[in-house]
């Protein structure tokens, strides 16, 4: 039986310990809070201080930065990037390779399309098709 954690050294020399999540085997940093029912696929990372709620899905290669919050039943598609302090609302879907900037807010049920960028600090709501709504 192999070890259930991985140590990764940052550029500044600091070492972070990541444990493998029971549901999907993705890597969860010490200090992150991930609900047991959330799916964190292998190859996905959740950084310290981040929170992932019940039923959320973080797929292969996705990266959730420090202090970000992922709401219940939200889906973060493959290779998407959620910036530091960003919030993704309940039931929202972030597309493949999409980027949500630092401190950005994605509304409940919003759909961010593949390769789309939500800038730092932006607040985004969409209709069911993923078209952005006026603020």
At which residue positions do the language-model features occur?
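Extended, small-residue-rich solenoid/repeat segments and analogous flexible loops
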Residues: 1-67
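Glycine-rich hexapeptide-repeat left-handed beta-helix
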Residues: 2-27, 72-135
């Amino acid at each position: 039986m192999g070890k259930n954690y991985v140590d990764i050294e940052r550029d500044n020399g600091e070492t972070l310990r990541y444990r493998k999540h029971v549901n999907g085997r993705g890597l969860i940093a010490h200090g992150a809070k991930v609900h047991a029912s959330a799916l964190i696929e292998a190859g996905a990372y959740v950084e310290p201080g981040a929170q992932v709620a019940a039923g959320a899905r973080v797929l292969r290669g996705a990266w959730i930065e420090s202090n970000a919050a992922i709401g219940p039943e939200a889906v973060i598609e493959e290779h998407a990037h959620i910036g530091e302090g960003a919030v993704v609302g309940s039931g929202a879907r972030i597309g493949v390779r999409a980027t949500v900037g630092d401190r950005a807010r994605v509304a409940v049920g919003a759909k961010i399309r593949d390769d789309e960028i939500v800038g730092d600090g932006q607040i985004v709501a969409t209709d069911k098709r993923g078209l952005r709504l006026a603020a």
